[in-house]
Amino acid sequence: MLRRGILRCFSILFVLCLLALVAGGAFLYLTPAGRVDRGTTYILVSPGAKYKDVEQQLQNKLWLRFPSAFRYLAQWKGLTSAPLRSGRYAIPRGATMPEVIEILQTAEQVPLTITPTALRTEDELITFLTSNLWLRADSLRTLLRDSSFMARYGATSETFRAEVLRQPFTIAWDATGKTLLDSLHSGYLRFWKG
C-alpha cells in the first residue's frame, strides 16, 4: 500500500514536471524574440558573415529576450552551421524566435530604396553609394573609370554621373557594382522614355 502511494506520488510529480517543461517550451517558442515596442528591424548580413556576427547584430538591434535559448534553437535548426545568405532582412514587430530564424534562413532580402542628392563629383557619388550599400569604394571607382565597361552604357565616367538622377531607385543592399550601375542606367532610360 505504501509502495503504491509512493509510485503514484512520483508519477504525478513526473507528469507535473513534464507539463511544466512543455509550458515553458511553448512560452519560449511563442513569445516575441525581442522588444515589441519597435517596428520592423533590419538585419544586414554581409557576404561571408558568420552566425556570431548576426547574433550580435540581433542582440544590439532587436534586444533578444532569451539569447541562450535563441542560440540553442538556431543550432537545432541549422542556422549556425549553414552559410548565411547575405542581404538586408526585415524582422517584423513581434516575430517569435522560430520566425526570426526562418527569415534568416529562407526569406528574400528586402530591397533598399535610395534617393541620390546633388552629387557633382565622382568622389561624392562613390561616397554616397558606398555609405548606403555593401559595396567597396575602390571596386566602384574601378568600374566608373573603366572606359570599356562604360561603353556598354554609351557613356564615359564623367557623363555617367549625369545619369544619376534625384529619383529614388530600389536595389538590393548587397548588390555588386555592375548591378548597381545597371540599375542606375535603366532608371535613367526609364526617366527619359517617360
What are these regions (language model features)?
Residues L2-G194:
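Conserved catalytic or metal-liganding residues and their short signature motifs at active sites
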